[in-house]
Amino acid sequence: AQGLTARLQSYESRLNTMDSQINEQLRAEAGTVNSIASNIAKLNQEIIRTSSQTGSAPADLLDARDQQLALLSARIDTSIVRQDNGAINVFIGNGQPLVLGNDAAQLVAQPDRFQPDRVTLAFRTSSGSVDVSSSLSGGSIGGLLDARRELIDPARNELGRLAVGLAEVTNLQHARGVDLHGDPGGDFFAVGGVEVLAARGNDGNATLAVTRTGSGALTTQDYIVQQSNGSWTVRRAD
C-alpha cells in the first residue's frame, strides 16, 4: 500500500513540477511579448514621422519592424492591419489590440481565477485585465498552453481517477474478508473528497459540496458551476 501511494505521489509531483516550469516560462514569454510590442510601437512612430517628411519609410526601419514581427510570431499567432501612414496594428487572441500605431498594450501573467498557484495570461485594459489564455494559439506561448491543457491536466485527472478506482476496488475486497479477530475488514485506503474551487471575484456567499457516488461515474474533465438569476448551470471547463 505504501509503495503504491508513493508511486502515485511521485507522478503527481512530476506533474506539479511541469506545471511550475510552465508558469515560469509564461511569465518570461509575457515579458518578451511586451518588449517586442513596445519596439514595434516605437518603430511605427519613427516610420510615421519619417514618411511624413520624405514621403516614404526607410528600408532599415521597415526591416527592423519586420524582424520584431517575426520574433512576435515565433511566440504567438498575430493578425496585422497596415495603415495608410505606414504604421501597422497588431492583434492577438480574439482581436485584442496589442499594438495600435505608436501605442503598445500589455500581456500580463496573473494567477488563475480558480487556482492561484497557476499562471494565466491576460490582456491589460484601462479597466482591469481580461484572461485571454483560452484564445491564444501558435508559437511558444501556444505550445505551453497546449501542453498544460492537452497533456498535464488530462494526465493529472486520469491519475486521480486511477487512484480512486484502485482504492475503491481494494477497499471493497478488503471489506469482504475478516481480520485476525474475526471482525470484518475495514477500508484499506482513505479516499479524499471532491475538490471544489471558488473563483476569484465571486461576490455571493453560496457554498458548494460534491459527493462522489462511485469511481465508475468519474471523468477526466473539470467542470464550472455558475449561478445566474436563480438558475445553476454546469459546463465542462474546456
Model-derived segments and spans:
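Structural signature of extracellular appendage/secretion-system components
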Residues: 1-238
